[in-house]
């Protein structure tokens, strides 16, 4: 039983650390949402070549965005509007909805990191002290953190859909969107992998709590 408990401790430590690193990397990078305008720019370039001579070159419009800022290909990154200042500015209802959603996921995802830190500390103590209730509490903590991560990611996806619809409504030439590639980036993929790993960590801690409980019952029976 000691061997099994040690294996569970190693698996929990590995998956927990992986989840923390991946989520921290996802939060800190700017490839959650990618807008690729290369096809549109090539089409515009062909039209300019067929027209009067014009040596001016249009700046690329492609961009990639994170939770905090958006970055253009040949320009510096610009921060997104602070969602916690919405009471001080006059915005439309749809824009206020976007700000509320933005403020929600920028709180939830870092909160999941904090939960994992506390879970890591209680998890270390629970294996060190072989405490059944502490193992159980740690498992519940990681499962709660996984749900927080899932909620944050889901709200971000919904936020992106609402922002896209808002942009379509404001765009006069909607046919141009057919030549623009819009997709989620690898930062979001890191967030999903972190969620799965965090969920697995919680399950491993619950399994360790059950294994320790069975071991203690067997020892008492002897």
Swiss-Prot record:
What lineage is on file? Eukaryota, Metazoa, Chordata, Craniata, Vertebrata
Which positions does UniProt annotate with glycan attachment?
A: 54, 88
What protein does this entry describe?
Transmembrane protein 114
Question: Which GO cellular component terms, listed alphabetically, does the Swiss-Prot or TrEMBL entry include?
Answer: apical plasma membrane; apicolateral plasma membrane
Alphabetized Pfam families for the sequence: Claudin_2
Keywords, in A-Z order? Cell junction, Cell membrane, Glycoprotein, Membrane, Tight junction, Transmembrane, Transmembrane helix
- Predominantly, its location class is other
Superkingdom of source? Eukaryota
């Amino acid at each position: 039983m000691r061997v099994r408990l040690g294996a569970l401790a190693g698996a929990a430590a590995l998956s927990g650390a992986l989840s923390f690193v991946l989520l921290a990397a996802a939060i800190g990078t700017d490839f959650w949402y990618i807008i690729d305008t290369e096809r549109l720019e090539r089409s515009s370039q062909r039209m300019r070549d067929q027209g009067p001579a014009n040596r001016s070159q249009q700046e690329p419009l492609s961009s990639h965005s994170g939770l905090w800022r958006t970055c253009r290909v040949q320009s510096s990154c610009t921060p997104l509007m602070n969602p916690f200042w919405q009471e001080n500015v006059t915005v439309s209802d749809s824009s206020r909805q976007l700000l509320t959603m933005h403020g929600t996921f920028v709180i939830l995802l870092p909160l999941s990191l904090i939960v994992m830190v506390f879970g890591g500390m209680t998890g270390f103590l629970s294996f060190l002290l072989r405490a059944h209730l502490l193992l159980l509490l740690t498992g519940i903590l990681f499962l709660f953190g996984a749900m927080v991560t899932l909620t944050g990611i889901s709200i971000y996806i919904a936020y992106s859909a609402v922002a896209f619809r808002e942009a379509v409504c404001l765009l006069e030439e909607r046919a141009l969107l057919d030549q623009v590639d819009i997709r989620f980036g690898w930062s979001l993929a890191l967030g999903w992998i972190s969620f799965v790993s965090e969920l697995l960590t919680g399950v491993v801690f619950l399994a360790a709590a059950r294994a320790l409980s069975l071991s203690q019952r067997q020892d008492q029976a002897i």
